[in-house]
Design a protein with these regions (language model features):
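Rossmann-like AdoMet
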Residues: 1-42, 48-133, 145, 150, ...
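A mobile, often basic/glycine-rich helix-loop segment
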Residues: 138-173
Length: 173
């Protein structure tokens, strides 16, 4: 049908849960004295951007309540659809986050791109350049890229395919 059940993974409660986990990481890094370098939170296939917005909102609330200095962070909304990225860049609710450097966008084709080029800041995130951990959020991402399945039989690797329907009754599978 082409429909993605977005409410299940892009609601305020899910955003708050992710924000809480991210805050835990930021707190741990701060307690280790690692609060100089920016932490990147990369959402692969951000779609409509709602989850990212909820996470940013909650992080701001939690950051204000934190008793310690946290490392700076930048949430990166990525997508393979340029129209979505343009929407994020123009959306009024995102402007404050862009201005603070807490939000950026990037076109990412997971089958081709090795680097993530941030559109607003011009920063290129590439392998080995960051010293802080990168948080990656991938709701409804891996189901939209080609997958390969292999198994091991008597010391030989073989590929296989998954079928949603069987030629035999379910009881015999």
């Amino acid at each position: 049908s082409g429909l993605v059940p977005h409410h299940l993974t892009s609601n305020a409660m899910v955003g708050k849960t992710y924000a809480s986990l991210i805050l835990g990481l930021l707190t741990d890094l701060s307690l280790q004295g690692k609060f100089e370098e920016r932490v990147y939170i990369v959402e692969l296939g951000a779609g409509h951007g709602r989850l990212g917005f909820y996470i940013l909102q909650e992080l701001e609330i939690m950051k204000a309540q934190s008793a310690i200095e946290l490392p700076p962070y930048c949430y990166v909304l990525t997508d393979i659809v340029q129209k979505n990225l343009d929407f994020f860049i123009e959306h009024e609710n995102f402007q404050t986050y862009f201005e603070r450097g807490q939000l950026d966008v990037a076109y990412v084709d997971a089958m081709v791109d090795e680097d993530i080029v941030l559109k607003k800041s011009g920063i290129v995130l590439s392998k080995g350049m960051l010293h802080q951990p990168v948080v990656v959020i991938a709701n409804y991402f891996f189901d939209s890229i080609p997958q390969h399945l292999f198994y091991l039989r008597q010391g030989t690797v073989a590929s296989c395919q998954v079928a949603l329907e069987a030629d035999v009754p379910v009881e015999e599978v």
